[in-house]
């Protein structure tokens, strides 16, 4: 019943931050069968278009989550193919918290199954399943000995770490990243490695004591009690504890009669009156589950935000912020800008001079890091008073795909720098940025983070990336946003929402056109750099795939 891993953070599936439990089903079997049929039909060559004499440009990928099914199911897992829309307003703050559903009920009543059915029926991305089983307190040596003999009461409110539960749920509702313990029921202890959860639009919290704490109740937007016959619950508990938790039948029955049943009568069943919805028969009650799903959908519609339009209409005619630093426009810098802005420039020259500018930009950005006095001894035995970096560590985070091109320049000047990536794409139907994927190094909250994107026009993607870093507890004044070219609109948007973020670029252009493209601009940087510049719609910057 432990919650499935979310992070992003973890091993980078292209949509790893979209958390969902394993949902086997008929559709999953059909998808897997179809995949097997295609793989058996022939070699990879049969799946590729014929190669002609001319070079065929690759197509950029954009999100269309409102016109395509947002799910890809296999027999083992559910992957959300739609990105996460903005969860903050144009001020960079979260205007509405994630929707939290509490699932209570007796042990083995089917809470986890009901939760998974709700997730499957919702068909929306970014759902987090949080299990109360992960929050059992760490047992003392004496308590572990009692638990090994089935003499410890795990069905009492005192067995749970409610302080950790409440703080974790609060952070999730605020959109922040959290670390969740993994409880080992075989050894009755927490495992060393905790799992990361992040990016919840909907939180489903389930557990036997889900309604046992007043503060916890106030965090739940919807409370559901799963009511199942006691005999069925006993059979399920026997099967689960014997097969999954290494117990014997005598020990399970002893524990049930001594602790589980009395705890249900004393602590759990009375909380049924606190529930908004009571689901008899658990997962077999499809009518109740459909009603729950309809209500959650209506709540999500009320939480939809439109950020990009608000950015376009704000901050007109304001002076450039003091947090902006533009690389000195020397003849050399202007000469390189002339080359990369020229539409006739070959791809090789575009890459060469872009890399030169990136190197200069990174070197310029490093001068804003904190330094302190230090003394070293020269080979001549003399003291030299100089400077050394006063921070803990430098981490680079690139906004895919164009921002990835700046990573080599950062690695060239920062030894052993850690690198993370964030993928943000535009939904063509809504025009809003959507978070599809992130992979961030562990423990970045004390690092100075260099956030890299080659062009910033409206600032929508940059704002989303900064918001992700803040959700992972990176201080705002330790974030440096680097870009080769920015529009004034993007500079104002980021600076207004995050006034302590340092913005560093090689040039700032005045205008953004009606299609939110920088004028005069540089063209679509990613297409020109990666050789995918023949785009039918005539896009002239990376916004067609990634919101700048």
Swiss-Prot record:
<keyword id="KW-0547">Nucleotide-binding</keyword>
<keyword id="KW-0808">Transferase</keyword>
<dbReference type="InterPro" id="IPR000836">
    <property type="entry name" value="PRibTrfase_dom"/>
</dbReference>
<keyword id="KW-0597">Phosphoprotein</keyword>
<keyword id="KW-0963">Cytoplasm</keyword>
<keyword id="KW-0418">Kinase</keyword>
<feature type="region of interest" description="Disordered">
    <location>
        <begin position="1"/>
        <end position="74"/>
    </location>
</feature>
<dbReference type="GO" id="GO:0044206">
    <property type="term" value="P:UMP salvage"/>
</dbReference>
<dbReference type="Pfam" id="PF00485">
    <property type="entry name" value="PRK"/>
</dbReference>
<comment type="similarity">
    <text>Belongs to the uridine kinase family.</text>
</comment>
<feature type="modified residue" description="Phosphoserine">
    <location>
        <position position="539"/>
    </location>
</feature>
<dbReference type="GO" id="GO:0005737">
    <property type="term" value="C:cytoplasm"/>
</dbReference>
<comment type="subunit">
    <text>Interacts with RNF19B.</text>
</comment>
<dbReference type="GO" id="GO:0005634">
    <property type="term" value="C:nucleus"/>
</dbReference>
<dbReference type="GO" id="GO:0043771">
    <property type="term" value="F:cytidine kinase activity"/>
</dbReference>
<dbReference type="GO" id="GO:0004849">
    <property type="term" value="F:uridine kinase activity"/>
</dbReference>
<keyword id="KW-0539">Nucleus</keyword>
<comment type="pathway">
    <text>Pyrimidine metabolism; UMP biosynthesis via salvage pathway; UMP from uridine: step 1/1.</text>
</comment>
<feature type="modified residue" description="Phosphoserine">
    <location>
        <position position="56"/>
    </location>
</feature>
<keyword id="KW-0067">ATP-binding</keyword>
<protein>
    <recommendedName>
        <fullName>Uridine-cytidine kinase-like 1</fullName>
        <ecNumber>2.7.1.48</ecNumber>
    </recommendedName>
</protein>
<dbReference type="InterPro" id="IPR006083">
    <property type="entry name" value="PRK/URK"/>
</dbReference>
<feature type="compositionally biased region" description="Low complexity">
    <location>
        <begin position="1"/>
        <end position="18"/>
    </location>
</feature>
<dbReference type="Pfam" id="PF14681">
    <property type="entry name" value="UPRTase"/>
</dbReference>
<feature type="binding site">
    <location>
        <begin position="105"/>
        <end position="112"/>
    </location>
    <ligand>
        <name>ATP</name>
    </ligand>
</feature>
<dbReference type="InterPro" id="IPR029057">
    <property type="entry name" value="PRTase-like"/>
</dbReference>
<feature type="modified residue" description="Phosphoserine">
    <location>
        <position position="63"/>
    </location>
</feature>
<dbReference type="GO" id="GO:0005524">
    <property type="term" value="F:ATP binding"/>
</dbReference>
<dbReference type="InterPro" id="IPR027417">
    <property type="entry name" value="P-loop_NTPase"/>
</dbReference>
<comment type="function">
    <text>May contribute to UTP accumulation needed for blast transformation and proliferation.</text>
</comment>
<dbReference type="InterPro" id="IPR000764">
    <property type="entry name" value="Uridine_kinase-like"/>
</dbReference>
<keyword id="KW-0832">Ubl conjugation</keyword>
